[in-house]
Amino acid sequence: MSTTSPQSPGFRVVARPKPAEYVPAIRPWLRPLLWGTFAGFALLGATGAYLAGVSLLNWLRPETLYTTPFTFWMFLAHGAIGLAGTLPFLLFGAAHWMTARRRPNRAAIRLGLLVFAAGVLVALTGIALFQFEGLPQLPSGTITRSVIYWAHVVLPVGAVALYVGHRRAGPRIKWGYGKAWGGVVGVTLVGMGALHGYDPRAAARKGSVEGEKYFHPSEARTADGKFIPAEALMHDEYCMKCHADIYRDHLHSAHKFSSFNNPAYTFSVNETREFGKKRDGDVRASRWCAGCHDPVVLFSGQFDNAETKFEDHPTGHAGITCVVCHSITNVHGPVGNAAYTIEEPQHYPFAYTTDAFLMWVNNQMVKAKPEFHKKTFLKPLHKSAEFCSTCHKVSLPVELNHYKDFLRGQNHYDSFILSGMGHGSRSFYFPERQKDNCASCHMPLKASGDFGAKDFDGSGRRTVHDHLFPAANTGLPALLKLDPRYSHMSDGWDRAIATHAEYLKDKKLRIDLFGVKGMRPDGSIDDSSLAVLRPDLPPLQPGSTYILETVIRTLNIGHHFSQGTVDSNEIWVEFTATDSDGRVIGRNGTTRDPDDAGPVDEWSHFVNVHMLDREGRRIDRRNPQDIFTPLYDKQIPPGAASVVHYKLAVPTDVKGPITLSVRLRYRKFDHLYMEYVHRGTGRPVPKLPVVDICADKVTLPVAGRSNRVEPQTSPIQPAWQRWNDYGIGCLLEGGVGAKRGNLRQAEVAFDKLLSLGANDAVWHGHANRARVLFELGRLGEAAAAVTASGTCDPPAPWWLRAWLSGLISAENATTAADLDAAAEQFARILDPANRPRDAAGVVTHDFGRDYVVLGRLGLTLFKRSLLEADGSPRQRAVLAGAVEAYQKALAVDPEDLPSHYGLSQCFAKLGGDATDEGPVGPATADAVRELVKALGAPGGRAATANQLAAAVTDLG
C-alpha cells in the first residue's frame, strides 16, 4: 500500500514487507542426529584408522602377519558402529535436505549432496564387504571385491574434503574438536598396537615337564613347546562352511584316516606300543609314529597314556585334520620324521561358539576380511615339496629299533628331487617342463562352487585343489567301507576307490612283452637269439624252452614306484601262457582264491622291497621296530625301466598258437598283513580291490602246426622306446651303479637304437651307451659316445652331456686340467644362469638342487686340491669350493652320506697343524657345530655337532 502526502507533492512512501524469520539449516530437533552422526564418524574413523594401519603393515611386510584376534574385535566394532549409524545418518541427511534445499548458496547444497552420497556409498560398500547371505558374494581375489574395498577406504577421505567445502556456508568449523579426536585416536592406536604382542591363550596353556623333548623321537614340535588343546585341532566342520568340496574329499582321504581310525595302522602302532612297554617300560619310542599319524593325540599330550585305547577315543579318530596341516608354521628341513613346527591357530571371534547368532557373526567376519584366515592357514611352505617331505621321508631312529641312529625308511622326497620330473639332471627321460612340487600331481584342480574356490589356472572357471590326494590307496577305503562306524559313507568310499584306481591306470606305468630268447641244451641263455615281438612274430618250437623278456616302465611318476610302505604294498606281475584250446601251459603271479582273493603266488615277481629283521625273517606286518635290512629292492626309478625274465617250456603236444599275456597288478595291503590285522577280531579277511595298472598281450605261432596268426603291433609309440626301455632295464638290473646288471645286453639294445635312425632314438642310444661303457670301465669309448650324442640331430640335452662328460673326465683324470674340466662341467649344470627356458623365457628345468651333481663337484674339487701344495692359499681356495658344494648338497639332503664324508675330508685338510698358517680354531669349530645342527634334525644332531666341532678344534 502507498500514500501521497499532501504536504510533499511528488514523493511516494512505500512500506516494505516484513522480512521472513531466519530458519537455521540445523533445527534443534536435528542436533541430536547430527551429534550422533559426528560421534559415529569419529568412532568409525578411529577403528578404521587402526584397521587401515594393520592392513598397511601387512602390505609393507607380507612376511609378517600383523593381524591378530584383537584386530577382529575392532573390525566387529567398526561394522557394528557402521550398521548402527547408517539409519541415523540417512534420517539426518533427509531432514537436513528438507530444511536447506531452498537456500540461495547452491554450491553448498551441491557439496552437501555429494557428502551425503559419499556416506551412502560408504555404507553400501561396507555392507557389500560383509558378504551377507542373500546378497551378491565377492570372493577374495576378484577385481570386483578390490574395487569395492578401495571405494570403501577412499570415499571417507573424499567425504571429509567435501564436508569442509560444504561448511564454508555455515558456522566456522571448530578444529579443536578434530585435534582432540586425533590425539585420542593416536594414543589409542599406540595402546592397541601394544596388545598385538600379547597372546592371551599362553596364560592357560599347559606343557610337558620335558618341554620340546616330549615329542621326540618324532621331529615335530609345537611353537612354544607346550601342548595344544585337542579341540583346537579337531575343527574340520568349521572349515566345511566355506570349503565343502574340499571337506568331502578330505573326509575320504588317507590323511583323514591316518590314525587309530585306520585298522591297518591301529594294529601296527599298537604292536609297536606294546613292544616299547615291554622293552623300555613306556611307549615313548612310538611317538616316532605319532608325529605324522596321530598329531591330535600327540600334541594334546595324550599319546603317552599307555593304557588308553585310542581306537575308542575321539582324538584317535581325528587323523590328520584340516587344522593340523594348515597350522604348520615351519619345516625344519628335508629330514622327514615330522620335521615341522605347529602352533595353535588364531581364530576370528566366536570360532568355537555353538550359539547360532554368534556363529553367523563369525562367518560374516571371515567372509568380510579373509586375509587373516588365508595368512593363518595357507603359507608359502604349503606349496612346497619340503612340506610333504615332513611325513613322506622317513628314517628309523635308534630310540625305535635300538640298532643304530639312522636307517632309511620310505623316501618320496629325495626320489622326486633327483628325478627328471623334479630337479635331476641325470634322468633317462625328461619332461618338457619339470614339476614344481608334489601337489602338481597329487592335488589336481577340480571344478568347485566353494566360497573358497578361485580361478587358479586362468581358465575362467573356479576350482579347488583335490584334497583326496589321488594316488594309489584303494585298500583303506575298502576296509573302512566294512566298518560299521563309517558304512554310512559307502558312496564316498566307492568314489575314492574308483578315483585312486583311475589315477593308477592313467599312464603311470606300462608293461611290454618285448622279446623272446632261446635256451641252449645245456640250460644257458642264447642272448644272440633275441627276437623282438611285434611286428615280427617268431614261431615257438614245441619241446623248446624260452626266456620271455618283459619290460615295466615308469611314465608319469616323479618318484620310485611304488615308494611308501613298500614292505606291505602288494604289486606283482601276472604272466599267463595259453594254447589255442585255452589250456594254460605257463602261469605265474596268480592269487590262491578265485576272483582275485587270497594270497599271491609267492614265486611271483613283486615290485616292492623284501625287508628283513635281525633273524632274517620278513617284515610282514608293518613292524618298523624290527626293521634291519632289505633282502632286495625291486622298485623302479622314475623315468626308468625294469626287466622281468620268464622261463617258458613249450609242451611237445601244444596245439595252435600260444597267447602270452602279462599285467601289472596292485593291491594296497599284503594278504598276510591283513590276516594279522583281522586275527582275533572275529571278522574274515576282506577281499581288497586289485587294480590292473597296465597289461600287454601277444599271440605267437607254433612251428610245425597249422595255425594262422593275425599281424600285431605294439601299442607303444614311438617304437624305438621299446629298445631303449629294455636297455635301461638291463643296465639297472642289480641296482643303480651296482655294476652287476646285464650290461652286455644293455649295450646291444642301445646299439640297436643307433641303427634305427629315428630322430630321438640316436641321441638316446649314444648317451645310454656312454652310461654302459662307463660302468664297464671303457672310458675312452664312453667319452666318444658322449661326443656323438651332441653331434646328432637332435642332440642329447646339454646338461646330460655335461654330467656324463664330467663323470668320465673325473674318473679318467691324470692331470689338474682334467679335474678342472670335470668340475667345470658339473658347475655348468648347477649354474642358475644356465637353466633351460622355453620360448617365452620361462625356466623349464632347475638342476641347482641335484645333490648328486653337487656331491660330485665337491669330490672333484677335493681331488683337485690334492694336487696343490699342502696349506697353500690355492689349496685352501679349492677346498673352500668343495666345502661350499658339499654344504649345498646337505642343504637339500642333510643325510647325504657322501657329502658328510667329503666334508670330513675337506675339514681334515683345512685343519693342518698348529704351525700352519690359518689353522682351524674355536671360531671355525663353532661354525661347524652350528652348520651340523642346522643341517640336521632338531634334537637329533646336537651330539654329533659337538663331537665334530671338537675334532676340528683338535685338528687346529
Model features per residue range: what roles?
Residues A719, D760-V762, P794-W798, P836, ...:
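Residue-level recognition of tetratricopeptide repeat
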Residues W763-G765, P797-R801, A839, V853, ...:
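TPR alpha-solenoid repeat register
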Residues P9-P17, G141, I173-G186, G197-A230, ...:
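Primarily the internal scaffold of c-type cytochrome electron-transfer domains
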Residues S2-G207:
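Membrane-embedded alpha-helical bundles that constitute the cytochrome b-like, heme-associated redox core
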